[in-house]
C-alpha cells in the first residue's frame, strides 16, 4: 500500500460495533461502515471500480482484499511499534481496553479494517475480527513475530540515525548496526525495510547514497550538500546501542547538563509551559544537528517569544554556542 493509498483511507475511523463478547466477524465490522468509507478503503486496497459496487458486494470485495496474506504481512510489518503493540495485545487477549496513554494508537489499524471498536455495557474496547485473527495466526506460526521484531529494530536504527545525524551514508548505517548487533544486516535487508517505511512518510528518506531526515524534503533536499560540507571530517559521535535507539523518538534529545540548564531557564525564567519548553528544546536540538549557526538558534527562541534581554540573552547565547556530543558527526 502506497502512502497515497493509505491517506485515501486515513480520514475514516470506522463505526463502533455494539457487541457482547470478543468474537466478531469481519463482515459484521464492515457493515458498520458507510458506503463512502468502504469505497475509500476499497480504493486503498486497489479494488477495481469500487464506485460501481453497492454495499454488500463492496463489503465482500474489501474483506477479500483485506485478508490477502501477503498484504496483511506488509501492512503489519509497516506498523509503528505503538500500533503493532496494540494489535498484538488485542489479538492475544481477544478484547482490549486501551489505556489513556494509548489514545492516539490504533487509528491506522481501524482505518485499514484490521481492528475494530466494540461497545459492551457502555464501555469501548478493541477487538480483531475473527477472519483477520485467523490469517494473522497463520503468519505468526510461520515466524512473523521474529521477522517483525527484526524489521522494527532496523527501522529504529534508521529513525535514530536520521534524527541524530540529519544525514548519514547508507553504508555507515549498516556498519553501526553490525557493530552493535550480533546478527548482521545486509544492504538488501536494509533497503527492504527502509522502502516499506519511506512509502508511508515515516520520518526519513533516501537521497543519493545517504539516509536523510525527511525534514530536508521541504526545500527539495538542497540543504543536504551544505550540511555535508559543514560537518566535513568531524568524527561522528556514536552512542551505545540503548542510548542511540532513544533517538528513534524525534522529540528525544540527550539530557546534557547544558540542556538541563536551558530547560530550567525556559521553565523558570521564560515561564513556558513544560510541553512548550520541551518543544523548544527539541527544535533547538534538531537545529544543532543541522549545524545551525548561533544566530539561527536565537531566531528559534525569538519565534517562541522567549525573552532575550539582559541576563536572559547571556544564558541563551551561552547555550547556543555550546558544542553538544551530537554535534560531532560525519
Where is each model-derived feature located?
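C-terminal helical accessory/scaffold domains
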Residues: 196, 213, 220-300, 304
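A short acidic, leucine-rich amphipathic alpha-helix
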Residues: 101, 172-174
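Charge-enriched amphipathic alpha-helical scaffolds
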Residues: 105-114, 182-208
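Conserved small/polar residues in nucleotide/adenosyl-binding loops
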Residues: 320-326
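Short capping segments at the starts of secondary-structure elements
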Residues: 94-97, 165-171
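Positively charged, polyanion-binding regions of nucleic-acid-associated proteins
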Residues: 24, 69-72, 149-167
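Basic helix-extension-helix modules of the SAP/HeH family
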Residues: 2-128
Amino acid at each position: 500500500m502506497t502512502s497515497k493509498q493509505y491517506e485515501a483511507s486515513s480520514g475514516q475511523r470506522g463505526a463502533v460495533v455494539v457487541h457482547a463478547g470478543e468474537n466478531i466477524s469481519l463482515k459484521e465490522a464492515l457493515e458498520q461502515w458507510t458506503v463512502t468509507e468502504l469505497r475509500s478503503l476499497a480504493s486503498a486496497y486497489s479494488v477495481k471500480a469500487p464506485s460501481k459496487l453497492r454495499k454488500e458486494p463492496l463489503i465482500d470485495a474489501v474483506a477479500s482484499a483485506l485478508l490477502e496474506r501477503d498484504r496483511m504481512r506488509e501492512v503489519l510489518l509497516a506498523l509503528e511499534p505503538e500500533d503493532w503493540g496494540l494489535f498484538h495485545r488485542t489479538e492475544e487477549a481477544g478484547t482490549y481496553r486501551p489505556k489513556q496513554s494509548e489514545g492516539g494508537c490504533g487509528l491506522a489499524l481501524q482505518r485499514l479494517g484490521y481492528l475494530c471498536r466494540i461497545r459492551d455495557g457502555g464501555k469501548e474496547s478493541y477487538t480483531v475480527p475473527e477472519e483477520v485473527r485467523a490469517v494473522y495466526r497463520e503468519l505468526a506460526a510461520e515466524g512473523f513475530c521474529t521477522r517483525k521484531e527484526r524489521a522494527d529494530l532496523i527501522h529504529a536504527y534508521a529513525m535514530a540515525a536520521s534524527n541524530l545525524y540529519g544525514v548519514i551514508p547508507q553504508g555507515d548505517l549498516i556498519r553501526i548496526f553490525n557493530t552493535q548487533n550480533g546478527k548482521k544486516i545486509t544492504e538488501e535487508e536494509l533497503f527492504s525495510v527502509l522502502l516499506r517505511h519511506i512509502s508511508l512518510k515515516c520520518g526519513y528518506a533516501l537521497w543519493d547514497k545517504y539516509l536523510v531526515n525527511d525534514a530536508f524534503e521541504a526545500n527539495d533536499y538542497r540543504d543536504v550538500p551544505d550540511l555535508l560540507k559543514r560537518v566535513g571530517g568531524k568524527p561522528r559521535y556514536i552512542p551505545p546501542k540503548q542510548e542511540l535507539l532513544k533517538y528513534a523518538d524525534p522529540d528525544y534529545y540527550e539530557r546534557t547538563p547544558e540542556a538541563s540548564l536551558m530547560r530550567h531557564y525556559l521553565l523558570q525564567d521564560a515561564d513556558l509551559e513544560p510541553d512548550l519548553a520541551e518543544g523548544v528544546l527539541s527544535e533547538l536540538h534538531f537545529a544543532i544537528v543541522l549545524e545551525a549557526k548561533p544566530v539561527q538558534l536565537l531566531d528559534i527562541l525569538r519565534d517562541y517569544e522567549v525573552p532575550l534581554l539582559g541576563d536572559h540573552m547571556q544564558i541563551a547565547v551561552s547555550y547556543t554556542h555550546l558544542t553538544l556530543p551530537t554535534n560531532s558527526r560525519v
